[in-house]
């Protein structure tokens, strides 16, 4: 017996949903002038006014997960990661949502982590689960490999103020984080910290003269009265290095010295005598 049950299609109907209760924690970025905030909620990109105006859903892509949104420093673009193709790819779109999104990467083969804009708004750097650190030029869409780790994913990457250097963290076989600097000009990386201590979170000073990082190198143990053991509970401190030989450390040792005054009134003249003066002295000597 053939049986059919008619329904009113309630499950497939559109409905209004309060997306504010589905904002993804930690996935937000403030516009460079502070007037709008961008977030991801229910897999879509949104921008929210700081005080007055409308909330915009920029993507409206059911079935697609968009995340890791970042506002370009010049305020023009939003960069984000989307699985619209079935794999994680990086896109940019204008912050007003008027223009169509632009796909920057292709052939995605693994999970991508957060993207970070260069200060000149021309490049994006990110790391992935295949232990790669890469950046892409948003104009040419050229992807460049910065570093290939062997044991663990890279820590967060940060740009220098002139967009010519990238500071990043990598763990090697000892699983101890180390801070490196990558030059976009030479395509080479330089180890900044040593192999003895855990270090991470390299960040440039606004003037580009210093690199700050967090390192576990403060060994001040606390002795337990019950466990008969030592606890190293507060090893992490903030440190910095100067990035040029000509840069003086603001914490360089100082040594006050006494300024010795020189008495110039009794100083003997060393000015050569003229020929006339020499003849006069010669005549005085002959007369005596």
Name every feature range the model reports, one short phrase each.
Residues 1-23, 49-67, 82, 93-113, ...:
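Multi-bladed beta-propeller domains
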Residues 32-33, 73-74, 119-120, 161-162, ...:
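Residue-level detector of Asp-centered blade-edge/turn motifs that repeat once per structural unit
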Residues 35-37, 81-83, 123-124, 169-171, ...:
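Short consensus segments that form the blades of beta-propeller domains
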Residues 37, 75-78, 121-124, 163-166, ...:
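Hydrophobic beta-strand positions that form the internal "hydrophobic ladder"
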Residues 46, 87-91, 132-134, 175-179, ...:
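Structural motif
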């Amino acid at each position: 017996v053939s049986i059919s049950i008619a329904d009113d299609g309630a499950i497939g109907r559109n409905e209004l949903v309060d997306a504010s209760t589905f904002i993804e924690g930690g996935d937000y970025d403030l516009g460079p002038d502070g007037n709008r905030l961008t977030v991801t909620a229910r897999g879509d990109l949104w921008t929210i006014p700081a005080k007055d105006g409308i909330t915009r859903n920029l993507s409206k892509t059911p079935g697609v997960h968009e995340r890791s949104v970042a506002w370009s420093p010049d305020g023009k673009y939003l960069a984000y990661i989307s699985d619209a193709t079935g794999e994680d790819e990086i896109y940019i779109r204008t912050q007003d949502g008027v223009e169509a999104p632009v796909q920057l990467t292709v052939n995605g083969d693994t999970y991508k982590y957060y993207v970070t804009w260069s200060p000149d708004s021309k490049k994006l750097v990110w790391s992935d689960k295949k232990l790669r650190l890469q950046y892409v030029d948003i104009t040419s869409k050229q992807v460049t490999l910065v570093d290939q780790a062997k044991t663990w994913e890279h820590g967060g990457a940060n740009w220098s103020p002139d967009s010519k250097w990238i500071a990043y963290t990598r763990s090697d076989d000892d699983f101890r984080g180390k801070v490196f600097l990558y030059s976009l000009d030479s395509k080479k990386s330089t180890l900044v910290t040593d192999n003895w201590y855990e270090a991470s979170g390299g960040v440039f000073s606004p003037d580009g003269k210093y690199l700050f990082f967090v390192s576990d190198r403060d060994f001040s143990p606390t002795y337990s009265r019950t466990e008969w053991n030592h606890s190293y509970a507060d090893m992490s401190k903030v440190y910095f290095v100067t990035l040029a030989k000509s840069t003086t450390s603001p914490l360089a040792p100082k040594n006050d010295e006494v300024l010795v005054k020189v008495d110039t009134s009794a100083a003997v003249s060393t000015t050569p005598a003229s020929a006339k003066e020499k003849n006069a002295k010669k005549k005085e000597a002959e007369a005596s």
